[in-house]
Amino acid sequence: RLGKVAGPAAQRDVQEVLSQLIEATSNFRLSEMRTRDLARFIEAWGLLRHTPKGRLMERMCNTLEQRLKFSRDASEASSNDLNSAGITGAILGMSLAGFKHEGLLSIMCETVPDRLFEFSSSEISKMLYSFARLEYRHRQYLLAMGDHVPHRLKEFTAQEISTSVYAMWLLKFRHRKFLTGVCDHLPERLPEFNVHSLCNTAYALGKLEFKHRKFTAALSTHVASRVKDLNKEKMVANMLRSLQTLQSL
């Protein structure tokens, strides 16, 4: 990112430093690394949009998978266990790097449901969207998320709600309790949404074919007051199509 901002010369310097760091990392003994550091490396590769050459990413994911299995089966918590930020970061990193490690994703989906209250609204929405990017659909995890999120919607920002709804559509997961909770909650918060979040939410609900008269009526009224903003972003037609879909359900 620094290289892109500073220009081609700086970008070459950044790439050179990155190459040296990657070479040094390849010599690490993964068994001696802390669990949180493994997760941080995976997140870092994703943020850099970089998948290391060879099998380094796979080896890190394999090691982290085994650590999580050990932690899950242990009778007591350990200081080496992965916290909510570490779990979210690793999932985000894999999604940004386009690296789909089935074993690690599976154990994370088995681990997270029992710990959802440890996760912030930001972490929950990031996880959902990361799974959507990876096209990874774990039914039990999504059922748990759908049951949990409606109870915490007041903690979510407008963007986090929009991201979560859009992720559920990308995953083609129509969870009635989740969708009902969102639509019950949204009318009073519509002014908080920017036009992109508003359009994405309406589009996703329409694609999921979820009928909720109160929300649709509130959205129709609200859109009339946001025509100028929608027109500025050239999104009037998109919103009207989504509204038409919701009204026809």
Predicted regions and their residues:
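Eukaryotic RNA-binding helical-repeat scaffolds
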Residues: 1-249
